[in-house]
Regions:
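Catalytic cores of eukaryotic secretory-pathway lumenal/extracellular enzymes that build
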Residues: 27-28
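C-terminal cap/loop subdomain of S1 sulfatases and analogous C-terminal strand-loop tails that border
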Residues: 1-23, 38-42, 46, 51-136, ...
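Short beta-strand-to-turn element immediately C-terminal to the catalytic PLP-Schiff-base lysine
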Residues: 31-33
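Long, internal low-complexity/basic segments
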Residues: 5, 53, 106, 111, ...
C-alpha cells in the first residue's frame, strides 16, 4: 500500500494483481542468459508459460517425456535458438486464479470465464472495464492492458475458445498425445457452466 501511495504499482500498466486472471497477475518478463548458445541479444513476444519449462529441459537433453508427464508443456527451446515462432505455434494456455477460476489464451485472444477475473483482489489504479460481462474477451495485440471486453463483438471467437477449453479438459491435456484423466473430476470446478455443453463429463 505504501508503494502504491508513492505511485509504484507492481503490475505496471496492466490490469489486475497477482492471483487474478488479468495480465497484472500473469504477465512477467522472462530473461535467459546462455552465452555459449545465445550470442546476440534477442527480444521476443512469444507466448510461454511456466508449464513449458519441463518440455524445454527435456528437449534440451533430447529426452522424451512419458505421456502422463508435462501434458500442458511445450518446448520453447527453438525460440531461444533464434527460430521465428508465433503464439499460434504455442497453442492454447490455460490460466488459473487464486480462487479457482479459469481463463484461456490462444494467439492474440484471451477469454476469462468470470466477471471479476477470478479473484476478489482489485488494483486501485485500474479504470472501470469497458463492456463488463460474465465472460471477458480481450485482443491482446491491441489491448494488452485489458481495457475493453470485446466478447459481444466476437461471438465466434468466444465459442471457439470455449470449445478449446472443453477439449483440453476432455483430453486431460493441452498438447498432442494420449488422453489423460483429470483429478479431481471437472464436475466441481468453477466456471464449468460457461462451456459445460462442450464437456464430456461422466
Amino acid at each position: 500500500k505504501t508503494m502504491q501511495e508513492q505511485g509504484h504499482f507492481s503490475s505496471y500498466i496492466y490490469r489486475g494483481l497477482k492471483g487474478t486472471l488479468y495480465e497484472g497477475g500473469h504477465r512477467v518478463p522472462f530473461i535467459v542468459k546462455w552465452p555459449k548458445i545465445i550470442k546476440d541479444s534477442i527480444e521476443t513476444d512469444y507466448l510461454t508459460c511456466t508449464t513449458d519449462f519441463i518440455a524445454t529441459v527435456a528437449h534440451l537433453f533430447d529426452d522424451i517425456l512419458p505421456e502422463n508427464i508435462g501434458e500442458d508443456s511445450v518446448s520453447f527451446l527453438p525460440v531461444l535458438l533464434g527460430e521465428d515462432k508465433n503464439d499460434i505455434d504455442r497453442g492454447g494456455i490455460v490460466h488459473h486464479s487464486d480462487a479457482g477460476f479459469f481463463a484461456i489464451r490462444k494467439g492474440k485472444w484471451k477469454l476469462i470465464f468470470d466477471e471479476n477475473a477470478g479473484s476478489r483482489r482489485v488494483d486501485p489504479k485500474d479504470k472501470p472495464l469497458i463492456n463488463p460481462g460474465e465472460i471477458q474477451l480481450f485482443n491482446m495485440q491491441t489491448d494488452a492492458i485489458e481495457s475493453t471486453n470485446v466478447a459481444a463483438q466476437n461471438i465466434d471467437i468466444v465459442e471457439d475458445l470455449k470449445k478449446l477449453m472443453a477439449k483440453f479438459i476432455n483430453e486431460g491435456r493441452s498438447t498432442v498425445g494420449k488422453s489423460q484423466k483429470n483429478d479431481p473430476t471437472p464436475k466441481g470446478w468453477k466456471n464449468v457452466s460457461h462451456f459445460e455443453s462442450y464437456l464430456k463429463i461422466n
